[in-house]
């Protein structure tokens, strides 16, 4: 099983149309095709959908080392709205601390316009690991 296979079991992210496209050590990419299920009442992508996209990308990036890592604190800033196309999330682990990693996720649209910026701290659990054969 790959790390992408492991995270494909995230039913909430899957229901929002989020999927991982690339994972390597401390880095991940995910995308979300904008559909009616992620639009708010004004026809823009709902903030929770953007958070879900970023959260999955962050989770993949910080879980490339073995120990199960969970988010403990996250922040998202919204810069532009999106209504159609595909959203792209690029996650980078900025601090690879043995217990408290920190990362950033940039969400852009098909034209490369910055839609949102997500930052998060994680906690590496000492009693749980993710058993995978490879990242991709």
Walk through the language-model features, giving the residues of each.
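Terminal targeting signals and extreme-terminal segments of soluble enzymes
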Residues: 1-136
């Amino acid at each position: 099983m790959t790390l992408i296979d492991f995270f494909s079991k995230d039913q909430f992210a899957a229901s929002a149309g989020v999927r991982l496209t690339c994972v390597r050590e401390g880095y991940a990419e995910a995308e979300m095709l904008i559909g009616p299920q992620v639009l708010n009442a004004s026809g823009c992508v709902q903030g929770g959908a953007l958070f879900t996209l970023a959260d999955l990308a962050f989770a993949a990036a910080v879980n490339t080392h073995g120990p199960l890592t969970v988010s403990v604190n996250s922040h998202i800033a919204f810069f532009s709205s999106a209504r159609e196309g595909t959203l792209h999330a690029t996650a980078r682990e900025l601090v690879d601390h043995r217990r408290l990693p920190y990362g950033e996720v940039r969400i852009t649209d098909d034209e490369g316009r910055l839609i949102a910026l997500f930052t998060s701290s994680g906690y590496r659990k000492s009693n749980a690991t993710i058993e995978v054969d490879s990242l991709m």
